[in-house]
Swiss-Prot record:
Membrane-spanning residues: none
Keywords tagged on the record: Disulfide bond, Glycoprotein, Growth factor, Kringle, Pyrrolidone carboxylic acid, Repeat, Serine protease homolog, Signal
Cysteine pairings via disulfide bonds: C68-C94, C72-C82, C126-C204, C147-C187, C175-C199, C209-C286, C230-C269, C258-C281, C303-C381, C324-C363, C352-C375, C389-C467, C410-C450, C438-C462, C485-C604, C517-C533, C612-C679, C642-C658, C669-C697
Keyword check for Ribosomal protein: no
Protein name: Hepatocyte growth factor
GO molecular function: growth factor activity; signaling receptor binding
Residues annotated as glycosylated: N292, N400, N566, N653
Top-level taxon: Eukaryota
UniProt domain Peptidase S1: residue ranges: 493-721
Cell attachment site (motif): residue ranges: 556-558
Domain Kringle: 126-204, 209-286, 303-381, 389-467
Length: 728
């Protein structure tokens, strides 16, 4: 260590059966290749609880949700018609149900290890095509007459018995279209004078209309305009893509519904046809194209606000003076960004515009050799400092930003007052909590924030910087400029001695079974480590594990006490903190070998020359590392002395702490990142610092600079208090 809402179904499913003999039918190929998971609506971290003891459940161990879906669709080995299932991710087990969340006597319940999948056929309120696969619960005809039960001959005799049309779900008196006839689902009526009548069930393309180009469309359409089934956004087959739900949480990437995340003329989706990567979806325009206030960009004519999507000025040349091509012209460049396709983007004449969410206004040019160019000569709008920056900790910030740093739209404060009261001990100033604007009602040291509508990220900081000249305070007598650390490889504790003391809070973070970083167990479900261990927000967490209760990094001899836990979520620290909190998929079990370590009080300081320790499995100065956990003893240095050792090139601010070895060359190195600097005060051991990349491995007379945990203690407590903990 230096150390170191309602959903559609498959198109004309009943017709597909009659197409099997056609020579090269698309539907046949699609059905063979189709992943049945596309037929289900997913509710993450949710399970169903039945209050009626007569309702049956079937369960069996299976490896994937896809396998559960296949058995549910085929009803293979099930004594009932499967309408939904839950996949237990931790135990790799399926639970199949003959009911769903709309069934009387059934309720949804949060469960961290569960994902609920409901067959869209049974919960949607719309139809695709003729509605042959509709299995919803509408039981009233278009004129308002109650339907006659299918197994009844009163008042009308008929041959449409459930036993004669197996698979058509002729249950109760629900509207159905068992023969796939024109007109859609129908039923025999309870009126002796009216034998049968169609039911008023809308097409899924009409359940929710779209405005403008459908960027805000969140409806249930899951087929393309040619009838192809959409690929799930959370799947990479048959087409690999970048639009992952976790990467774009505000784009509405639910299941396999049509969306428009990239500024195309209208909503689209990837398809299940390997030969057709994507197609547009047929969704009707709203009669009155009104948009929510949060969807409308600020219109400007003399300057650009944000990315300039609301620019409506008359600049008509790119940055180097080349004139723009008219938007309604196809010469010299052909394109589909026309006034007809983008009716609400004001594509008049040849004015610079940003219809597709690019980084700034642009246009096609009249030069055949220059297809497009940015109009970067348009100035940025002047924004008052109260809107685009904050002073102090931002408690008086009154700007109108309403998005988090991860791109999530803020939730209205009035909807979150109960949650806010849970972690503050005073009555917040409601007059400041306007709409869903970023604010700092709890005096957070790290700036304005807001609640979100995402249950996985209850709240987050907003991308607002401190105003110019209002910098982070430095520690007393520290007045030298901060120099960025040179890039180094992962750190390890060099010349540390093996330790077998009680360090049950020490964590080895593994990526594909290889140790990459250390960490500290601060709560049963939470690990504190360094951001450098997770450089990308979009890495697949299934490849990561947390090993606890071990002394040997390979687990040799530690099998009986070792706990291996999956990581379910990353929570990045405040901007510039170099910290990340890991939420475990299930809580660690505290015993003689696994324990938690205390956090310091917010803002506390530790006296100079206090002896502390760093722990890690990193590089030890030897080619043949034994893989044992090592400890190196360091002492706390003040700013002045630390700066001297760094030739005056380093100044500590309030988020940093300095510690070094007195004589022996020891300290963190490769593999120790994320590990703790542990100090003892009043017989209590605490994690005072976190190891982050330094300036080399245990360089003589070069003390290490750690992230000062005390400065971020309130943030850590706030995360633990507000983020839901997985159930054991």
């Amino acid at each position: 260590m230096w150390v170191t809402k309602l959903l559609p179904v498959l198109l004309l499913q009943h017709v597909l059966l009659h197409l099997l003999l056609l020579p090269i039918p698309y539907a046949e190929g699609q059905k063979k290749r189709r992943n049945t998971l596309h037929e289900f609506k997913k509710s993450a971290k949710t399970t169903l609880i039945k209050e009626d003891p007569l309702l049956k459940i079937k369960t069996k161990k299976m490896n994937t949700a896809d396998q559960c879906a296949n058995r549910c669709i085929r009803n293979k080995g099930l004594p009932f018609t499967c309408k939904a299932f839950v996949f237990d991710k931790a135990r790799k087990r399926c639970l199949w149900f003959p009911f769903n969340s709309m069934t009387s006597g059934v309720k949804k319940e949060f469960g961290h290890e569960f994902d609920l999948y409901e067959n869209k056929d049974y919960i949607r309120n719309c139809i695709i095509g003729k509605g042959g696969s509709y299995k919803g619960t509408v039981s009233i005809t278009k004129s308002g007459i109650k339907c006659q039960p299918w197994n009844s001959m009163i008042p009308h005799e008929h041959s449409f018995l459930p036993s004669s049309y197996r698979g058509k779900d002729l249950q109760e008196n629900y509207c159905r279209n068992p023969r796939g006839e024109e007109g859609g689902p129908w039923c025999f009526t309870s009126n002796p004078e009216v034998r049968y009548e169609v039911c008023d069930i809308p097409q899924c393309s009409e359940v929710e209309c779209m405005t403008c180009n459908g960027e805000s469309y969140r409806g249930p359409m899951d087929h393309t305009e040619s009838g192809k089934i959409c690929q799930r956004w959370d799947r990479q087959t048959p087409h690999r893509h970048k639009f992952l739900p976790e990467r774009y949480p505000d784009k509405g990437f639910d299941d396999n519904y049509c969306r428009n995340p990239d500024g195309k003329p209208r909503p689209w989706c990837y398809t299940l046809d390997p030969d057709t990567p994507w197609e547009y979806c047929a969704i009707k325009m709203c009669a009155h194209s009104t948009m929510n206030d949060t969807d409308v960009p600020m219109e400007t004519t003399e300057c650009i606000q944000g990315q300039g999507e609301g620019y409506r000025g008359t600049i008509n040349s790119i940055w180097n003076g080349v004139p723009c091509q008219r938007w309604d012209s196809q010469y010299p460049h052909q394109h589909d960004i026309t006034p007809e396709n983008f009716k609400c983007k004001d594509l008049r004449e040849n004015f610079c515009r940003n219809p597709d969410g690019a980084e700034s206004p642009w246009c096609f040019t009249t030069d055949p050799n220059i297809r497009v160019g940015y109009c970067s000569q348009i100035p940025k709008c002047d924004v008052s400092s109260g809107q685009d920056c904050y002073r102090g900790n931002g408690k008086n910030y009154m700007g109108n930003l309403s998005k988090t740093r991860s791109g999530l739209t803020c939730s209205m404060w009035e909807k979150n007052m109960e949650d806010l009261h849970r972690h503050i001990f005073w009555e917040p100033d409601a007059s400041k909590l306007n709409k869903n604007y970023c604010r700092n009602p709890d005096d957070d040291a790290h700036g304005p924030w807001c609640y979100t509508g995402n249950p996985l990220i209850p709240w987050d900081y907003c991308p607002i910087s401190r105003c110019e000249g209002d910098t982070t305070p430095t520690i007393v007598n520290l007045d030298h400029p901060v120099i960025s650390c040179a890039k180094t490889k992962q750190l390890r504790v060099v010349n540390g001695i093996p330790t077998r003391t009680n360090v049950g809070w020490m964590v080895s973070l593994k990526y594909r079974n290889k140790h990459i970083c250390g960490g500290s167990l601060i709560k049963e479900s939470w690990i504190l480590t360094a951001r450098q261990c997770f450089p990308s927000r979009n890495k697949d967490l299934k490849d990561y594990e947390a090993w606890l209760g071990i002394h040997d990094v390979h687990g040799r001899g530690d099998e009986k006490r070792k706990q291996v836990l999956n990581v379910s979520q990353l929570v990045y620290g405040p901007e510039g903190s170099d910290l990340v909190l890991l939420k475990l998929a299930r809580p660690a079990v505290l015993d003689d070998f696994v324990s938690t370590i205390d956090l310091p009080n917010y803002g506390c300081t530790i006296p100079e020359k206090t002896t502390c320790s760093v722990y890690g499995w990193g590089y030890t100065g030897s080619i043949n590392s034994d893989g044992l956990l090592r400890v190196a003893h360091l002492y706390i240095m003040g700013n002045e002395k630390c700066s001297q050792y760094h030739q005056g090139k380093v100044t500590l601010n309030e988020s940093e702490i300095c510690a070094g070895a007195e004589n022996i060359v020891s300290g963190p190195c490769e593999g120790d990142y994320g590990g703790p600097l542990v100090c003892e005060q009043h017989k209590m051991r605490m994690v005072l610092g976190v190891i982050v990349p330094g300036r080399g491995c245990a360089i003589p007379n070069r003390p290490g600079i750690f992230v000062r945990v005390a400065y971020y203690a309130k943030w850590i407590h706030k995360i633990i208090l507000t983020y839901k903990i997985p159930q054991s």
